Every structure is written in structure tokens, then in C-alpha cells.
């Protein structure tokens, strides 16, 4: 109860300091008119669309990072723990090599084969060397996600798919044969299946 009068006095002083200058300015005609409600609604809708686009983009980038973590350390350590001691490094290196190999193949022509406009089985050369893959969304795939983000998200799955296969022939295949097989598998099997 003792604090109520000083608090009440403080509130009255704040109201006086804000209301009196506002009333004087309004009387003098200095207060600008509020923009029409349609302008305010249009501005709010634009801000909501930008926030939705940013949220979609962030969600896909975080998801892409998590899939990359499943491939790099996740599968590498898992497969490394399944093999004999002498083959641990070679088996782990397979997962990390596939990350680099599939990324290069995807950037050169894999994305174009999977998501370009072509025939029923394989895409065309629309996005060869990632041509035309920029920050603008592609309405064919996702209206609120930049094409680069979509490309990275799809790249992560193009990486983890052959990395999962390497567990089937851990300790059973030469390293050079693995690289050749995974290159052919990505080009002949994965990219056309992703296009269909």
C-alpha cells in the first residue's frame, strides 16, 4: 500500500508527458493521418510472406545439414565400427569420398539430369553446371524456397543414398572400383529415378 501513491504519481506523470504534446500537435494539425487500412494490410501480407519464405528456407537448410551429418560422421563411424581393425580407415574414407564425388557430379550435371525438363526418364541440360539455379524460387518445385536451397537439400539425399550402399560391400571392394561404381550408379540409377 505504501508504494501505491508513488506508482500512481509516476503513471500520471507519464500520461501527462505523452498526452499533452500529442493533444497540442493534434490541435495544430501536425499529426499525420494514418495510412489507409488496405495499405497496412498489404504491407502485413508482404511481411508474412517474407517470414514464411525465410522459415521454409531455414528449415530446409537445417534439414540438409542434419542429413550431411548422418552421412559424414554418422555412416562413416557406423561402418567403421562394423569392419575389422585393418579396414576401419578405408571404410570411413569411402563415406567422405562419396560426399565429395557426388557433390561434384551433382553440380556438373546430376541436378540437371534429375530436375531439368527433359523426357520421361532423364532431365535435359537446363541446369548444366547449375545454370539458372539461383536465389529465386522455382514454382515447379517449391514456391517459397530458393532454387539453391532446394538443390542443396536434394544433393544431401543424392549423397546419402550411395553412402548407404557402401555398407553392403565394406571390406569387399577395391577403392577405385567403388568410385567407378558409385559414379555410374549415381548417373544411371539415382538421377533418372529422382527425375521420374
Predicted regions and their residues:
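Hydrophobic alpha-helical transmembrane bundles of multi-pass membrane proteins
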Residues: 2-8, 17-196
Amino acid at each position: 500500500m505504501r508504494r501505491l501513491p508513488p506508482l500512481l504519481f509516476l503513471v500520471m506523470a507519464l500520461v501527462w508527458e505523452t498526452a499533452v504534446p500529442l493533444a497540442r500537435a493534434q490541435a495544430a494539425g501536425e499529426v499525420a493521418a494514418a495510412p489507409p487500412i488496405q495499405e497496412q494490410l498489404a504491407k502485413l501480407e508482404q511481411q508474412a510472406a517474407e517470414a514464411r519464405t525465410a522459415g521454409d528456407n531455414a528449415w530446409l537448410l537445417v534439414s540438409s545439414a542434419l542429413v550431411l551429418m548422418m552421412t559424414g560422421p554418422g555412416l562413416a563411424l557406423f561402418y567403421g565400427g562394423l569392419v575389422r581393425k585393418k579396414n576401419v580407415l578405408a571404410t570411413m574414407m569411402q563415406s567422405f569420398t562419396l560426399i565429395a564425388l557426388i557433390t561434384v557430379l551433382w553440380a556438373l550435371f546430376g541436378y540437371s539430369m534429375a530436375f531439368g525438363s527433359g523426357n520421361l526418364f532423364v532431365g535435359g541440360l537446363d541446369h548444366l553446371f547449375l545454370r539458372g539455379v539461383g536465389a529465386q524460387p522455382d514454382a515447379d518445385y517449391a514456391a517459397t524456397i530458393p532454387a539453391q536451397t532446394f538443390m542443396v537439400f536434394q544433393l544431401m539425399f543424392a549423397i546419402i543414398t550411395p553412402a548407404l550402399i557402401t555398407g553392403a560391400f565394406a571390406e569387399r571392394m577395391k577403392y577405385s572400383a567403388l568410385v567407378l561404381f558409385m559414379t555410374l550408379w549415381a548417373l544411371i540409377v539415382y538421377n533418372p529415378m529422382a527425375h521420374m
